[in-house]
Amino acid sequence: MSVKQINVFLENEPGRLAEVTSALSKAKIDIRAVYVTDSTSYGILRLIVNQPDDAKIVLQSMGFTVSISHVIAVALKDVPGTLDQVLEILSSNGIQLEYLYAFVGRASVDAVVLLRVDDREKTLEIFEKNGIKVLDDKEVYGI
């Protein structure tokens, strides 16, 4: 079970991020979560949207370099310590966390944490064994 994440390579220039959000807005694509990393000359924009395949097409048609990767979405109670529990489980099972970001949706009281790991299938098995609620793509896109 995974969620499609849009990855967009952006030059560090004024207005580049606004070009992306404007294009998605015009295409009626709703952004659910956003995460930006940057370096001196470029950034990587990571998006969870309600229509990932359409978003990729729209952005590529505008000349952006776009890829889709798969991340795991888990629902966590929005209380202190729940993220720590998940990270401890990953660590104790030898799973390398590449990055994560989180958001609180409007259709749930839980926080949603999106994780990119080195072994997605093993992580899903570990989460199931430990009672961690993994969300499917439709649940995340609908939040």
Where on the chain are the PLM-derived regions?
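A conserved regulatory-domain signal marking ACT and ACT-like small-molecule sensing domains
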Residues: M1-I143
